[in-house]
Amino acid sequence: MWTLEDFVRESNRIEGIGEPTSAEIEAHRRFLAIPGISVADLEAFTATVQPLAVLRRHVSLNVCVGTHFPPPGGPGIELRLETLLEDATPESASAYATHLSYETLHPFTDGNGRSGRVLWLWMMGSAPLGFLHEFYYQTLRAQQGWG
């Protein structure tokens, strides 16, 4: 069974980041204990794991991720994130679909992968075999119509 520390280590490894700090592990622990996620909760989490990153709520905060061009920065980013989070409940939404929408929106200037994965884990409740294992099978189910 994977521990939270294993999850954080895997999440960092996906980004090419070294071993997690105690502050990063604690930020994950705090986030997972929140009953309902808000934009402010994601901002607080991201400030710990990527201190210079900010929410792209200002018009000039545009980013490019490889060949993906997320929506331009501005007030619409925060509004879209609020809408995404309103729908992001473990009971009513797919963690897989929410994660894809979050990464497509790319609401922060940096740290979106790790903040997106902690949101995914919050929705899942647990990932006994880790993010990559669970997300791999979620992707297969989504693409091939598996139950």
What do these predicted regions represent?
Residues 1-147:
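FIC/Doc superfamily catalytic core
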